[in-house]
Amino acid sequence: MANTSSTTSDIVVRARVLIADDEGTLLEFEAENEHCLMRGAHEVRVIASPELDALHNGPYNEIALGDYTFHFNLVAANRFGAQVMLFAKRDDIKVSGAVFRLKVWNSKKRAVAPPHHEPEPVPAEEGAVADRAEPESGDAPPSPKKQKLDEREQD
């Protein structure tokens, strides 16, 4: 269950750029203090920083660094702010240092997609006639096959 009686955040994290290259930027969010978390939801306060502005410009992937999941939301009113909920899967999870990462993809670079591989056509066996994919213009559509019935069903 979420702790709703407290007005302070469970965890405070600060964003820093871990790697920046042509493909994008890897942001790492580090906790300022060590925390021992119980199972359930915990609010994570993200300190506003210019590094978070890049998240508004392109897609990003979330990477958890422990036995928990998290949900990351951008704030429309503040391009340098974010809201995070962390969901601990079990009791007594120690959180310190790097808590989670976000991989921000470069939106200015053209979209790179994995290559689409078409299945290779199977060569026809020797002496066998290859199937035609579509009927030719003069061909009639194939007629439906008739079902054989027993003598009792025919009566």
Curated annotation (Swiss-Prot):
Pfam families: TLP-20. Residues 109-155 are annotated as: Disordered. This is Telokin-like protein 20 homolog. The lineage of its organism: Viruses, Viruses incertae sedis, Naldaviricetes, Lefavirales, Baculoviridae.
